[in-house]
Each structure stands twice: as C-alpha cells, then as structure tokens.
From Swiss-Prot:
It catalyses: L-isoleucine = D-allo-isoleucine. The keyword Isomerase applies. Optimum pH is 5.0 for the forward reaction, and 6.0 for the reverse reaction. This is Isoleucine 2-epimerase. Catalyzes the epimerization of L-isoleucine to D-allo-isoleucine and D-allo-isoleucine to L-isoleucine. Can also catalyze the racemization of many nonpolar amino acids, including leucine and valine. Does not have GABA aminotransferase activity. Keywords: Isomerase, Pyridoxal phosphate. The lineage of its organism: Bacteria, Bacillati, Bacillota, Bacilli, Lactobacillales. Belongs to the class-III pyridoxal-phosphate-dependent aminotransferase family. It comes from Lentilactobacillus buchneri (Lactobacillus buchneri). NCBIfam families: PRK08593.1. Homotetramer. GO terms for molecular function: identical protein binding; isomerase activity; pyridoxal phosphate binding; transaminase activity. Its EC number is 5.1.1.21.
Amino acid sequence: MGKLDKASKLIDEENKYYARSARINYYNLVIDHAHGATLVDVDGNKYIDLLASASAINVGHTHEKVVKAIADQAQKLIHYTPAYFHHVPGMELSEKLAKIAPGNSPKMVSFGNSGSDANDAIIKFARAYTGRQYIVSYMGSYHGSTYGSQTLSGSSLNMTRKIGPMLPSVVHVPYPDSYRTYPGETEHDVSLRYFNEFKKPFESFLPADETACVLIEPIQGDGGIIKAPEEYMQLVYKFCHEHGILFAIDEVNQGLGRTGKMWAIQQFKDIEPDLMSVGKSLASGMPLSAVIGKKEVMQSLDAPAHLFTTAGNPVCSAASLATLDVIEYEGLVEKSATDGAYAKQRFLEMQQRHPMIGDVRMWGLNGGIELVKDPKTKEPDSDAATKVIYYAFAHGVVIITLAGNILRFQPPLVIPREQLDQALQVLDDAFTAVENGEVTIPKDTGKIGW
C-alpha cells in the first residue's frame, strides 16, 4: 500500500470539527470512490472491501443499475414529503416489501431514514397494538442510535454513559452463545440454559401480560455474528405466542441476502415475525429504512404517530427498487450462500494452522472470526485482532473488529471469487505475521474499535 499523506492531513483537519461520538476509530481511510468490492482512497490506494459499509452495500458500490435509478429519479423528482402526498417509487416499494417479507400473513410498511428509527417504530407499534408497555431485548444487541433504539441496544457502555435515563420499560436478557459453553454441553443444553435465563425476568419482576414484544436479531451482527440455536429461537417464539407477546426481529444488518437467505429469520424453520426492521442495504446505503409488520399490527397507529419528512424519499425508493432487482436477478442470495460456504472452509483451514482463531461463524458472506489467546480458555485476544486488521489495511484489505476480538467479515455480495481469494490470503498472511511478532500498532492511534 502507498502513503496516506493526503488522508492524514484531511483527517487532522476534520478532527477540529467532527464530533468523536459519531465515528468509531479504526485507521486512516479517506475513501474517494468505489465500485463493486473495490475502494480507492484519496491517495490513490486500492482496497478490497470486506465490510460493505457495515453491511449497507450488499449489491456492491456504485452498481450501474442503482446509479441509473438514482440519476433517473433525481431528474424527475428529488423529494416531496410522503407525509402528505404520494409518489410512484414509494408506492411500488411498499408493495414490494410487503410481498417479500417472510411469512404468508398480509403485511404493511412504514418508511424511515435509518435502521434506528425502524426499531423505534417496533416499540411504537408493539405498544399500540398490544396495549402493553414492556419490551424485551438482548445483551450484545445493536439496534441503533435514536433514544429508543439505543435503549434497546446492549453492545456498548458509551451508548448509555452520561445520557440517561434511557427509555423506561425495556428489559435485556442474555443472547445465547454456542461458543463459550460449559464442559459437555450440547446445543440442546445451551438452548435450554439460555431459555431459562430468558424466562427468569418473567418469573420475578416482568409481567408477561404487560409485555408488548420481544425484539431479537436472528443472528447478532455487532455482537459478533452469533446465531441463536434453532431450538432456542423456537422456544422464545412459542413463549411469545402463548402469552400474546409480539415477536419482532431486527434485519437491518443481516437481511437482504447477507446470510445466504433473503432474511436472516429464514435460517430458522417456520417463524413469521409480527414486526421486522430493515435498513442499511435496503437502498444501497441511501438513507432509507422500513418497519414491516402484519397488517393488523400496522393499523394500530394513526398519523402522525410515525412519519418523517424525508422518509420514503423518491430517490431513495428508486434506489431500493433497483437494489432489490439486483439481488433477485443477479442471484445474490444464492451467491452469498455459495461464497460464504467457500469462505468458511478457507477460514476453517486457516484455523488448523493458526491457533489464535478460536471460532469461525459464517452464514452466507457473513462471518465472525473470533480471535483468542488460547483455544482452550477462549480468552478474547483484542490485541491480536487489532494487529490483524492493521496488517490487512496495510496490504489493501478493509476489515474491522467487533467486540474487540472478532473480525467482521461482510464483503459486498458481488465480490468476485478472485478478489475474495486475494483478501483471504491477506488475512492468512496477517495471522502468520501477528503470530511471528511482526506487526506493531502506531502508538498515537488511540482506542481502536468498539
């Protein structure tokens, strides 16, 4: 990789004006342009993107069909608020999303500007429909940065520090972890243990008949790409139905083909959510989100209970329609499944040679590669993970960490196999270099990652 002179100067200048609360620190990358799975920075350096803008660019950067849809719509109508009137792209998109949502029940849609407000919407609609106040969410979850979604989240102290009190009546329970288990535990044992933890609040202080919904990520994204066991998910789903509690899912990070299924919930058998949030890749990174819910639930609120001036913007809606077409007609769900299986095998092979790789979790092109100090104790190794991503960056690969010690592997779904192989080789080399003590982190970098 070449020098970062221009990038470093620009960042030094930006730091005078840009609040540190709005960016997690990794390394000095100032992106100038991008296409497919390739990034080019302001100094002319090229990188293979293994992050896809936090899983917001599933169809790849500047996909021709998405760019054309944006340009064509911008020539006709950039914006008129859907809060009062109508436009065709929004009409078409609401119908499309209602029809492709998981399950056979009639669905309705409400648009927003980010996954954060889509999760706020889940709080609103769940409380309105049930007439109940309590919401159950999960430790390790990330649902956004509006006040409601930030309260729902459980992944960072900085999301509650100095800004409380948070939204009342939100209860967090542990998310099942099939990697760190007790000796001799089977997946069945793990499911039952965590389901018992799930039930404890209901047995002590949380009235089930006053609980509006349970919100869960079928696969936790920022928590480390962790999938709940099938049996656990079915037990929670059944519990919700037995107690009149809505079952809601967050598909913002994991939806739209990321997991090798259109929706992450389709990794499980016969589960139909009452409410779901989508965003990020919905419009290829353009500011658009949606809450999709069963018709009767979505009819529980009247305007202006959940509307935004720019939500469902015509340009964003056109971008989303084009994005959904690309996912369908280019077979990206199937490609994600195939390439993800290939990448998983490559990482498992690396694990045999690199004991720092404690766990390889992969569903589609969607992986959490957990680095540990010892495969027996499973003690997290954040130092090694930081060195791996710095080595990767220096050798033309963009990847970041989750929870300090987990590599976040989420490339654009369009990544060619050749680029995927190149990136995987760089990571393999990075593990070797770190093991040999050949990687150091600059002293002035500050705190890295979450």
